[in-house]
UniProtKB/Swiss-Prot annotation:
CDD domains assigned: PBP2_LTTR_substrate (cd05466)
Transmembrane segments annotated in the record for this chain: none
Protein's recorded name: Probable nitrogen assimilation transcriptional activator
Record keywords, A-Z: Activator, DNA-binding, Transcription, Transcription regulation
One MF annotation (Gene Ontology) recorded for this entry: DNA binding
InterPro entries to which the protein is assigned, alphabetical: HTH-type_LysR_regulators, LysR_subst-bd, Tscrpt_reg_HTH_LysR, WH-like_DNA-bd_sf, WH_DNA-bd_sf
Keyword Glycoprotein: no
Signal peptide coordinates: none
Domain of life: Bacteria
Pfam families noted in UniProt: HTH_1 (PF00126), LysR_substrate (PF03466)
Length: 309
């Protein structure tokens, strides 16, 4: 049973004539007749009385309401898909890491909204692991996350490197290490640290660096809010290793200081992840282009970014 057969039967029922039905859909009469006959053969019963004007049989009368619903649903589906393909979707959903959303993304969102004012933006702040899961589940259109080993093995995903930024040390002005110009990893291993919760890319990145250096990470507290990080570090007991984007507000806090680590320096890579099929949608393609323009080599200098955002 094919959609064309159902549409042909509906047109004949509406017009009462093979000829008029053919004119309505723009094909010849024999095509309509063949499609209706094929449907009747498949159902095993006649749908029309073929004497004079075509009239529905009892079976045809029962089928007619369903024919209308099926054909209407198909037309609605075609219209909605056309709207997507021509950029007339109503919303764009994305998930981002907390530190990215507050620093790098506002200008991109602003430019996108100015150019696509009819699209409602939905931005969720999630850890990288969770963001990738909801992306794969089809609940969002795109994600901006930290680099992950799983990204290199993810079929069907288009992955763009947006930027690479340094991870630095956030301390209280009263912390014993605050006077140092750069803090050695050996020293960091002996002081209590605040880290991101499990499932956040930053936690894995920091843990991996300590393992590579043969050191132990002294993590004493897990958080997932940048405000909470700043609050507990102000108390002077803990310190935190955070990416530059997460340190924008801390730079203006007189009770906090930021120091680089000694060599080897640690960086994190931020990537835009989009399912391949989503790139057929104009708003998604345009958002991708805006992200790539915003994260050019000139804008990836942190001092420039901190002034812009």
């Amino acid at each position: 049973m094919r959609l064309e057969q159902l549409q042909a039967a509906l047109r004949v029922a509406e017009t009462g004539s093979f000829q008029e039905a053919a004119q309505k859909v723009g094909c010849n009469q024999s095509t309509i007749s063949r499609q209706v006959k094929g449907l009747e053969d498949e159902l095993g019963i006649a749908l029309f009385r073929r004497q004079g004007r075509m009239k529905l049989t009892a079976a045809g009368e029962r089928l007619l309401p369903r024919l209308r619903r099926i054909c209407q649903e198909w037309q609605t589906a075609c219209t909605e898909i056309e709207e997507l393909l021509t950029g007339r979707q109503t919303e764009l959903c994305m998930a981002i890491a907390d530190s990215i959303g507050g620093c790098y993304l506002p200008a991109v969102l602003n430019r996108f909204q100015q150019q696509w004012p009819s699209i409602h933006l939905r931005v969720s702040t999630l850890g990288s692991d969770r963001a990738l899961k909801v992306l794969r589940d089809g609940l969002i259109d795109l994600a901006i996350v930290m680099d992950s080993p799983t990204l290199t093995t993810s079929a069907g995903l288009v992955v763009d490197l947006l930027l690479e930024e340094e991870v630095q040390v956030l301390l209280s002005v009263d912390h014993p290490l605050a006077d140092q110009k750069a803090i050695a990893w050996e020293q960091l291993s002996h002081v209590p640290q605040v880290v991101f919760k499990d499932g956040y890319g930053m936690q894995r990145l920091v843990e991996q660096r300590f393992r590579e250096l043969g050191l132990e990470l002294n993590s004493c507290l897990e958080l997932n809010s940048l405000d909470s990080f700043r609050g507990v570090v102000r108390e002077g007991y803990w310190l935190a290793l955070l990416p530059q984007a997460a340190l924008v507000d801390a730079r203006h806090d007189p009770r906090l200081v930021i120091r680089p680590t000694a060599e080897p320096r640690l960086t994190r890579r931020i990537k835009l992840v989009i399912p391949e099929e989503q790139l057929s949608l104009p708003p998604v393609r345009h958002f991708r282009q805006l992200c790539r323009e915003a994260m050019t080599a000139e804008l990836c200098d942190f001092k420039t970014l901190s002034q812009l955002f």
